[in-house]
């Protein structure tokens, strides 16, 4: 009886293990999206990507949109994340702590870099970054390079001290706060115009505020920042990483992929990348004290 029970338990464990293999319905590949823009846009994009990947790879996927960048970083630390579309700073932290790998980079109209932009209302009297001194200012998130870290470094280096600062948590929220006069100035991501249309964060609220280009002006730009990466858990099977990367690049070239990615921070494509492409920014973040 004991022998039969032992054999049964071994077989049961084996079946359970098989059911729990990564990519099965019981253990889908867990794909996280950074909450940098409106959740509805993220849901639209992630749903389309999930549908495409499940049709073009042999695996199942589960999409998650947490409340912060850091939640994604820690999800890698507890093996709750396999892939993530993450901001550059979050990736740098996750790479340092958990060895995640950057395999893909977003591309915007052929550009693989972007910048931070300082914004102010056109009627505010704020004409340059130095005028922010003593004013109320909105940042995006403490883990955002374009929405906090590099702008903060500029302010500190030039001895510019806002009277009050707030975190809006999303780039479009910052633009809205500046537009509505809730703050005097703010910082968000910037990409140059394409075909006569703005591609910076103001574009995200243009449907709601058609005159945002006239009401909210750019008063300064930062140095170049590499575009956000798609990252993978370091011990995820290499076959999976390669296949998923190939299919994601193909997805970005489809009509549906182009539609959902473009509405998401003006992304127009995905290209291969490596951790080395982020070394310069990694060094800058370390200099800022962003990595202990």
Locate each region found by the language model:
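Bacterial signal peptide processing site
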Residues: 16-18
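Extracytoplasmic small-molecule ligand-binding "clamshell" domains
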Residues: 20-89
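Short loop->beta-strand "edge-of-pocket" segments that line small-molecule binding or catalytic clefts
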Residues: 29-35, 130-147
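C-terminal motif of bacterial Sec signal peptides marking the signal peptidase cleavage site
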Residues: 11-14
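Beta->alpha turn/N-cap motifs
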Residues: 35, 65-69, 79-98, 171, ...
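Acidic, polar ligand-binding/catalytic clefts
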Residues: 74-131
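An extracytoplasmic/periplasmic, membrane-proximal ligand-sensing/linker region
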Residues: 26-48, 54, 236-292
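Pocket-lining segment of extracytoplasmic ligand-binding domains
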Residues: 124, 136-239
């Amino acid at each position: 009886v004991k022998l039969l029970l032992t054999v049964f338990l071994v077989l049961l464990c084996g079946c359970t293990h098989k059911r729990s293999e990564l990519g099965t319905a019981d253990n889908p590949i867990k794909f996280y999206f950074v909450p940098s823009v409106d959740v509805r846009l993220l849901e639209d994009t992630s749903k389309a990507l999930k549908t495409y990947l499940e049709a073009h790879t042999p695996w199942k996927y589960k999409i998650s949109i947490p409340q912060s960048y850091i939640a994604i970083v820690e999800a890698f630390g507890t093996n709750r994340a396999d892939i993530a579309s993450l901001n550059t700073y979050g990736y740098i932290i996750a790479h340092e702590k958990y060895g995640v790998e950057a395999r893909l980079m977003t591309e915007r109209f052929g550009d693989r870099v972007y910048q931070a932009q300082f914004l102010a209302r056109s009627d505010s009297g704020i004409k340059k970054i130095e005028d922010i001194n003593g004013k109320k200012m909105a940042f995006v998130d403490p883990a955002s390079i374009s929405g906090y870290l590099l702008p903060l470094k500029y302010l500190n280096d030039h001895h510019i001290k806002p009277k009050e600062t707030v975190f809006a948590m999303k780039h479009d929220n910052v633009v809205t706060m500046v537009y509505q006069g809730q703050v005097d100035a703010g910082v968000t991501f910037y990409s140059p115009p394409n075909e006569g249309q703005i591609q910076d964060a103001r574009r995200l609220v243009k449907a709601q505020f058609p005159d945002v280009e006239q009401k909210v002006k750019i008063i300064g730009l930062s140095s170049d920042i590499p575009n956000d990466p798609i990252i993978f858990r370091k011990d995820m099977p290499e076959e999976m990483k390669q296949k998923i990367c190939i299919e994601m690049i193909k997805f970005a070239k489809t009509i549906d992929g182009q539609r959902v990615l473009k509405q998401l921070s003006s992304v127009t494509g995905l290209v291969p990348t490596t951790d080395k492409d982020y070394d310069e920014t990694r060094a800058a973040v370390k200099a800022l004290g962003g990595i202990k």
